[in-house]
């Protein structure tokens, strides 16, 4: 029965000059792209539920390697009590690649029940095999989930066109709101702003991005 703590609610975010430069560059690209490619459809309003601080939940384990549901339950209650705006389950922070399919399903059921509709929920469903990601989305009960968080394909190092085609297939396979996840330090490839904008303008259910490229 290990004690689970999370200091994310107390973390201060400091903006560096590099980050400011990146934001200014992205904003300039957005303005140019919007002018050249006016969007005809409106994004899914689910994105409005995901404003504020979203906490990526870890997966606590016992010494024997099994999931510690008691600790996970305490962690969920802690985040809700400390004013998290929404929860992210089964992301990379949850060590999802190390979980079996049955563990993923059981963890999702547990978090959904424990949350009991108190906060919006985002579920991580991603990978480097497009077909497997789509099959997982279609076979998962998403009735209590507000959006899918899907990471850029890792290890394979796809081209920008390959990244576009990956997310295009996912967006066309579901009506669920999709959050892109760009973390090149982990995946080995950076999704460029132009690719993000292309996807966002062409697919209204792509509603947001978790941008973790930093100084990549």
What are the roles of these predicted feature ranges?
Residues 2-11:
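Extreme N-terminal basic, low-complexity initiation segments
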Residues 173, 184-216:
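Catalytic alpha/beta core domains of metabolic enzymes, predominantly
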Residues 47-55, 61-190:
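Active-site beta->alpha loop and helix N-cap motifs at the rims of alpha/beta catalytic domains
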